[in-house]
């Protein structure tokens, strides 16, 4: 949530800031702004409510800041409504800042400063930080930042410039992510790697309360007490092309089509002699035997990947698995022990609730395993064990390929757990692994049938509300399909276990209401068909996602998407693809901004 970019170098700073902020649009925002040192050393600020295009148009009308050092920001409103005044950057006297996070004690700090005669122009917690920095300023930016952050409670990533230190950018963080990009005679700060890929792949990870100083001589980093520290240079394994659309109309469509490659890249290094091998992740069969319970903790789409994992691990390994929403897990006072494994799933590795849940689990003695896509992220660094998914950058807010590789990893874990528990033998495991390796080819074939998903989408665009139903693994899929549709089409959608319809939900069915039924599980197929007939008889317009071999009668479905025959257990990896495409094309046909849906952020870094 929110995006921060900063630059010091010889390039046109405004161009660099706008380009970087464009690469961070996926994080979600409702306003944008930049602050740039002019050639004479003055700070020029331009900011606007709305999209980056609105900011660009405003600069064209009112004047474009020019210079070689500055900071930029895309804001997601948390304190104060979206407006020009509340947009970042915020200036307090001699200090101008951009901020990602939430300052929990901003009201107390504001009251303290107000009592000292300080006045405020906005409703934001960010301006409070700017005014506090100015109030504390003693001529030494590093000392002032160090003294000020000790008074801040909550989370923050800050880009800071001081009026009397032209062409120098300062940065610090606590909980909220921030990196320092290292170019040739230029340097950057950014909330995420894609913002700097056009210029460099090298960067530092800024640790908690460290202070970075960027000037024309390079970068220096200090700890919270002003002592210089040596940093390890890291190199991103993504290139600029990975963060571009590559000829697709939207990032989401590109990322849906990248799923076969992402699966191969993620699972191939973890398979040896036809069996799962997670030793590189410090996961061995011997270690897995010690766990008597598993908790999967995540948010949104990642949580849905955990539900698939729950079904598969319990079925194969016979180990009890509980799936928790991270924000609920933290506050329900979970009972944990050293015999429990807590699996944290997060694409960004910075999801605030998931990070806090993991820390809680560690404090209570449980072992933690992180499944993340972003290298060097907070969750990745703090987990006891770690599996990286190799999806590459996922720019669209609605997750697709990250979900796919998350469930691929959950399958590998399930196979490894089952082998360790002795509930399957190596022959059966090799068969399952071989089928998992076949999924990319099957998905590639499914992606060729876009016309059917477009046709289905055209039947949904006027709907006000719809339901997704399924049983077992199909119910897990219906949860993800429903979320995808509501995220980007803005159609109200809910998922329900098909067997629960008669317990209240069926009262919602009205004539012409769309119901998307997922029925891929052979063992549950007839029962699901019975549930489908019940909603069809009450006027529902049914879209059936099932195996291609089944030909539904008129009393079962109006439309069908057929899937190849495949192992029940692995069917989610195939069946989710048409659900993704249906959501995508529905959104496109409704004229929505698919990659940047309203009110949503890609990485939720505040609670």
Model-found features: residue ranges?
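Extended hydrophobic-aromatic, low-complexity segments
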Residues: 181, 305-306, 322-323, 352-355, ...
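Generic C-terminus detector
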Residues: 226, 541, 554-556, 566-607
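Active-site phosphate/pyrophosphate-binding segments
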Residues: 259-263, 267-295, 385-514, 587-607
């Amino acid at each position: 949530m929110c995006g921060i970019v900063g630059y010091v170098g010889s390039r046109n700073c405004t161009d660099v800031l706008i380009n970087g902020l464009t690469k961070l649009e996926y994080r979600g925002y409702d306003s944008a702004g930049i602050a740039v040192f002019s050639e004479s050393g003055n700070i020029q600020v331009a900011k606007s409510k709305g999209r980056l295009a609105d900011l660009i148009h405003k600069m064209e009308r009112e004047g474009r800041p020019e210079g070689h050092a500055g900071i930029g920001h895309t804001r997601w409103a948390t304190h104060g409504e979206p407006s020009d005044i509340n947009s970042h950057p915020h200036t307090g006297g001699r200090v101008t800042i951009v901020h990602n996070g939430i300052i929990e004690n901003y009201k107390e700090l504001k009251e303290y400063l107000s009592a000292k005669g300080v006045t405020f122009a906005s409703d934001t917690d960010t301006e409070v930080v700017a005014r506090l920095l100015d109030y504390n300023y003693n001529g030494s930016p590093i000392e002032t930042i160090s003294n000020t952050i000790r008074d801040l409670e909550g989370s923050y990533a800050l880009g800071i410039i001081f009026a009397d230190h032209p062409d120098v950018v300062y940065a610090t963080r606590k909980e909220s992510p921030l990196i320092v990009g290292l170019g040739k005679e230029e340097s950057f700060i950014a909330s995420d790697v894609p913002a700097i890929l056009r210029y460099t792949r090298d960067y530092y990870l800024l640790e908690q309360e460290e202070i970075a100083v960027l000037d024309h001589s390079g970068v220096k980093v200090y700890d919270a007490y002003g002592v210089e520290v040596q940093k390890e240079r890291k190199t991103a394994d993504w290139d600029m092309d990975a963060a571009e659309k590559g000829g697709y109309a939207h990032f989401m469509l590109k990322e849906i089509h990248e799923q076969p490659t992402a699966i191969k890249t993620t699972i191939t290094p973890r398979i040896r002699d036809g069996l799962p091998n997670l030793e590189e992740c410090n996961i061995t069969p011997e270690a897995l035997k010690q766990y008597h319970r598993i908790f999967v903790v995540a948010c949104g789409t990642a949580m849905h990947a955990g539900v698939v994992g729950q079904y598969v691990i319990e079925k194969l390994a016979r180990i009890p698995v509980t799936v928790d929403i991270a924000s609920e897990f933290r506050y329900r006072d979970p009972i944990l022990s050293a015999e429990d494994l807590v699996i944290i799933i997060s694409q960004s590795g910075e999801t605030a609730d998931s990070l806090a849940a993991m820390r809680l689990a560690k404090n209570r003695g449980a072992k933690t395993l992180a499944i993340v896509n972003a290298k060097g992220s907070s969750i990745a660094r703090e987990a006891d064990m770690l599996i990286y998914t190799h999806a590459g950058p996922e720019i669209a807010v609605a997750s697709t390929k990250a979900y796919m590789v998350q469930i691929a990893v959950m399958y590998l874990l399930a196979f490894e757990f089952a082998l360790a528990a002795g509930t399957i033998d190596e022959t059966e495991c090799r068969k399952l692994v071989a089928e998992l390796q076949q999924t990319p080819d099957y998905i590639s074939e499914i992606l060729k049938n876009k016309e059917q998903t477009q046709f289905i989408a055209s039947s949904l665009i006027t709907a006000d509300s719809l339901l997704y139903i399924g049983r077992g693994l199909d119910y897990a899929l219906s949860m993800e399909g429903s979320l995808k549709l509501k995220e980007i089409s803005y159609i109200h959608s809910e998922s329900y276990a098909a067997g629960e319809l008669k317990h209240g939900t069926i009262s919602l069915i009205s004539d012409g209401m769309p119901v998307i039924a997922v029925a891929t599980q052979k063992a549950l197929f007839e029962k699901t068909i019975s549930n489908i007939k019940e909603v069809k008889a009450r006027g529902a317009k049914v879209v059936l996602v099932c195996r291609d071999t089944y030909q539904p009668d008129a009393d079962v479905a109006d439309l069908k998407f057929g899937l190849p025959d495949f192992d029940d257990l692995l069917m989610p990896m195939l069946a989710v693809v048409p659900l993704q495409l249906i959501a995508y094309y529905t959104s496109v046909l409704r004229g929505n901004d698919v990659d940047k849906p309203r009110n949503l952020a890609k990485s939720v870094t505040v609670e």
